[in-house]
Amino acid sequence: MFSKQDQIQGYDDALLSAMNAEEQRQEDHIELIASENYTSKRVMQAQGSGLTNKYAEGYPGKRYYGGCEHVDKVEQLAIERARQLFGADYANVQPHSGSQANAAVYLALLQAGDTVLGMSLAHGGHLTHGAKVSFSGKLYNAVQYGIDTTTGLIDYDEVERIAVECQPKMLIAGFSAYSKTLDFPRFRAIADKVGAYLFVDMAHVAGLVAAGLYPNPLPYADVVTTTTHKTLRGPRGGLILAKANEELEKKFNSAVFPGGQGGPLMHVIAAKAVCFKEAMEPGFKTYQQQVIDNAQAMAQVFITRGFDVVSGGTDNHLFLVSLIRQGLTGKEADAALGRAHITVNKNSVPNDPQSPFVTSGLRIGTPAVTTRGFKVTQCIELAGWICDILDNLGAADVEANVASQVAALCADFPVYR
């Protein structure tokens, strides 16, 4: 029998030590990985609730197990809030991750071997958009488009040319490292020209979309997926959205369960419901505007300091810095910044001469630092510190000086007050 007083402390101190160390790292380090953010304690409360005990295969009102009357209400709340937040007619809140939401879309709309056209991972796309190492590149005939390496922008005429040539059954719009605004009407027109489904993966910009600061793909796409973390600032999970279409809705539901998953994670669905409610608060738009302002301010510092920012700047929460001209690798830059307690991720850039394990770029994002309360002033200062380290790569004194300034800034802006 379990006790309500059970604690990890004193029972599994080795595990607790690692957990506490990670929480301390989050407080003491500046987080600039574009896909990371901090959730509210409300989201954490939902994830740590007794809902984790309940199996609930199926959908609200159509479960395969009994005792689901309360979790049905939880899931229905999440569904209704997701629909309201994004202006969708349909929402499936069960996918465990963005990749599983994407896999469900493939399963619902395609047959193995069908042709899909998505953005190349090397040019800012995502693994699930047709990369050879992903299920999307193994089970389907994946054709890739990229950016114009001169402008750093998607060349929609070229996307259309490739689409006409390969006749995809599904056209994918979305990215993991593209800093400009996607033209959803143009993607729709290209999809219509070749008779393809248009699938939009808005995982990185869902929070901006919810705040009305980035175009909403729902009016144009046959289906939209997103994660619920990143800019949306919720738990790690996935979400599928669409306009009203009874036939497609049934396909999406079946592709999630039983097609790709068993029982949903009800504690995570509850946390999604919390984050959707938080995203409807007036302050959420203010936060998202600050995310954009901070990213644009940081990108400008890099440009001023002589670094190449892919696409020439940013319209959203992230930007990609090419280190090719400086003769540096993303791997060594990532490590040097880590020693100064600044966390970024190495990232491939277009026409990267290095392997994906080394790379020639850094991806930088501002959702997490903005959650801490950083404004443009702090982000300009932070970008300058990063440039100092990159200009003096391996200089221990520079790293130590930056680390001390990082410590002071983190103390002034704790993650949780």
From Swiss-Prot:
(6S)-5,6,7,8-tetrahydrofolate binds at L121, G125, H126, L127, S355, P356, F357. It is an enzyme of class 2 (transferase). Catalyzes the reversible interconversion of serine and glycine with tetrahydrofolate (THF) serving as the one-carbon carrier. This reaction serves as the major source of one-carbon groups required for the biosynthesis of purines, thymidylate, methionine, and other important biomolecules. Also exhibits THF-independent aldolase activity toward beta-hydroxyamino acids, producing glycine and aldehydes, via a retro-aldol mechanism. It catalyses: (6R)-5,10-methylene-5,6,7,8-tetrahydrofolate + glycine + H2O = (6S)-5,6,7,8-tetrahydrofolate + L-serine. The record marks H229 as: Plays an important role in substrate specificity. GO terms for molecular function: glycine hydroxymethyltransferase activity; pyridoxal phosphate binding. It comes from the Bacteria. Transmembrane segments: none annotated. Its main location: cytoplasm. Homodimer. Belongs to the SHMT family. One of its GO terms (cellular component) is cytosol. It is found in: Cytoplasm. It holds the Pfam family SHMT. CDD domains: SHMT. This is Serine hydroxymethyltransferase 1. Pathway: One-carbon metabolism; tetrahydrofolate interconversion; Amino-acid biosynthesis; glycine biosynthesis; glycine from L-serine: step 1/1. The keyword Amino-acid biosynthesis applies. The gene is glyA1. The keyword Cytoplasm applies. It comes from Pseudomonas syringae pv. tomato (strain ATCC BAA-871 / DC3000). Its EC number is 2.1.2.1. Its cofactor is pyridoxal 5'-phosphate. The modification N6-(pyridoxal phosphate)lysine is found at K230. Keywords: Amino-acid biosynthesis, Cytoplasm, One-carbon metabolism, Pyridoxal phosphate, Transferase.
